[in-house]
């Protein structure tokens, strides 16, 4: 299983690769898109400057820096939906990206995916992004027919569900998101913009609340459900416990979230994922062992214990009983 890391600038690439990243992905907003939609609506769901290469030339430098270490770079063009008039222009942009050595694009709009399929760029992967909400093998098969050779699964899935999809994916390579950026909503159905340079998204804010249901007060269980996500810092999201088992079930790449974050944070994330993967390869652990090791590594990485609201794979928490067992192993 490869480690796929975000990258924003050429000078970050060596440190990320040294930490263990084997693939990188970046953001880029073409000038014509900025002219059409202004500074808020991005073609890759990140509008603040830190999350995108500053120019096409800077992106080319980034690709060159990664290629010196034989590490491929993908570029996110994963806005959805995309206005029809922009599809041909983004296909032209993809052609320019292929020319400078970008190895693929991440897309989340079906019309763009189909147009890129028809363009038939050589050695250029079409990656179906997580906004397609691929929760099952039928969704993966549909996206494969639409041109995707890689699919990023919905980030709300359990490790067992991911393993089941991998078994039916055939030649389609599967990516799973598993570190930083856990979404409290079903991401593919969420219309929030991710445009705050401070990286506090609308789903993390505390809102005034009113109640229109039966009774005079908001029921405690409703308040508790809301409180699980309010004020949550997605920087602390983690799925380390599942990494050894995801690798053994055939996930192609573990994707780390974090375009626009500081270089040190990206490097720490890559190191943590690489350390958990290496430990899993040496020990071939069951679920309970993975859970214990993941929690210890989380504490080392963040300096605090893991919490339920930050957990990508809650089935690895003690209350879940580690119900998933890989064939031939006891949890």
Where in this protein do the model-derived segments appear?
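As written
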Residues: 147-148
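Conserved nucleotide-cofactor-binding alpha/beta core module
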Residues: 136-138
């Amino acid at each position: 299983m490869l480690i796929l890391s975000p990258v924003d600038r050429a000078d970050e690439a060596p440190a990320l690769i040294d930490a263990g990243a084997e693939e990188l992905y970046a953001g880029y907003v073409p000038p014509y898109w900025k002219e059409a939609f202004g500074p808020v609506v991005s073609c890759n769901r990140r509008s603040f400057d830190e999350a995108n290469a500053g120019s096409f030339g800077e992106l080319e430098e980034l690709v060159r820096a990664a290629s010196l270490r034989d590490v491929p770079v993908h570029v996110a063009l994963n806005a959805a939906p995309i206005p029809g008039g922009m599809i041909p222009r983004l296909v032209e942009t993809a052609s320019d990206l292929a020319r400078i050595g970008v190895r693929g694009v991440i897309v989340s709009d079906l019309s763009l995916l189909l147009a890129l399929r028809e363009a038939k760029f050589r050695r250029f992967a079409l990656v179906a992004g997580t906004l397609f909400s691929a929760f099952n093998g039928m969704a993966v098969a549909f996206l494969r027919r639409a041109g995707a050779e890689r699919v990023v699964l919905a980030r709300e899935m359990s490790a067992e569900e991911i393993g089941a999809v991998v078994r039916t994916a055939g030649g389609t390579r599967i990516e799973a998101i598993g570190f930083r950026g856990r979404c409290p909503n079903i991401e593919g159905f969420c219309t929030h913009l991710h445009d705050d340079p401070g990286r506090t998204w609308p789903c993390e804010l505390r809102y005034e609340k009113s109640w229109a249901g039966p009774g005079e007060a908001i029921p405690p269980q409703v308040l508790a459900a809301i409180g699980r996500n309010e004020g949550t810092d997605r920087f602390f999201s983690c799925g380390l416990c599942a990494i050894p088992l995801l690798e053994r079930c055939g996930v192609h790449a573990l994707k780390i979230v974090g375009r626009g974050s500081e270089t040190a944070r990206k490097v720490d994330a890559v190191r943590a994922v690489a350390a958990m993967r290496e430990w899993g390869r040496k020990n071939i652990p069951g679920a309970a062992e993975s859970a214990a090791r993941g929690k210890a590594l989380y504490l080392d990485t963040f300096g605090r214990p893991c919490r339920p609201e930050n957990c990508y794979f809650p089935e690895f928490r003690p209350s879940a009983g580690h119900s998933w067992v890989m064939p031939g192993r006891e949890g």
